[in-house]
C-alpha cells in the first residue's frame, strides 16, 4: 500500500483521535482549525489522498462521514487480523442522528478463565461505528472476567462483541455454554472430542466429548474486542 506523508498521517491521526474521544469524526472545518490548514480545499486535498491510498472511506454527502479503514488502523498502530487487533474505545449514550454509530446491548459477563454464568439481561448499551462490525447485525456485548484469553488481546474488563450463531469454524473464538455456564475460548473439533482452548499458556483447555456436544453450546462467535474510554 502507498505510504503516507507526514501531513497525511497527521490528518489521519486527528480523525482517529476525534472518533476515539467523541464517537464521531470531525468536520472538514474542524480538521483545518486543529491542524492549521488554512483552506477547506487544502483539507479536502489531504482527505482525497487518504481515500485514494486506501486509508479513508468517505461519503461526499455527509460532512462527518470520514471512516478510517483497516489499513488506517494498522498505520496508526492498531494492527489487524484476529479479535485482539479489533480493539476500539467504547462510547456511551445514544447514537447521533445521521451518524454511522450503532448501539450494542451489553447483556452480562463472560469468563475468560473459569466459566461463569452470563446473565441474559441488558445491563448497558454502548455505541461503535458500524464499519467495525461490517454486516454483522445480531451482535451483543459481554464483559470479560479472567485472563485466559490474554494471548488473543482479550483482557479482564474488556467487552467482547458476539455475533449470535449456533455454529463456528475450527479455531474461531466463541462464547460457549458448558454445564450451564458461559466461557470464551477458541474451539477446535478433534475427532471424538471438542476442545475449548484458552490462549493463556498457564490455563488448561476444556474438553467435551463429541457425543455430549450440542450445537446449542455455541452461543456465538466473537467479532470484536472493545475497551471503554477511561
UniProtKB/Swiss-Prot annotation:
Active-site residue list: 148 (for autocatalytic cleavage activity), 185 (for autocatalytic cleavage activity)
Marked site (Cleavage) residue numbers: 112-113
UniProt keyword Cell division, yes or no: no
One of the record's GO molecular function terms: serine-type endopeptidase activity
CDD domains: S24_LexA-like
Disulfide bonding pattern of the chain: none
Annotation: DNA-binding region: 28-48
Keyword annotations of the record: Autocatalytic cleavage, DNA damage, DNA repair, DNA replication, DNA-binding, Hydrolase, Repressor, SOS response, Transcription, Transcription regulation
Gene Ontology biological process terms in this record: DNA repair; DNA replication; negative regulation of DNA-templated transcription; proteolysis; SOS response
Reactions accelerated catalytically: Hydrolysis of Ala-|-Gly bond in repressor LexA
Record EC number: 3.4.21.88
Keyword Electron transport: no
Highest taxon in the source lineage: Bacteria
Pfam families the record matches: LexA_DNA_bind, Peptidase_S24
Family the entry assigns: Belongs to the peptidase S24 family.
Binding partners and assembly: Homodimer.
Free-text function comment from the UniProt entry: Represses a number of genes involved in the response to DNA damage (SOS response), including recA and lexA. In the presence of single-stranded DNA, RecA interacts with LexA causing an autocatalytic cleavage which disrupts the DNA-binding part of LexA, leading to derepression of the SOS regulon and eventually DNA repair.
Protein name according to UniProt: LexA repressor
Species of provenance: Anaeromyxobacter sp. (strain K)
Name of the gene this protein is made from: lexA
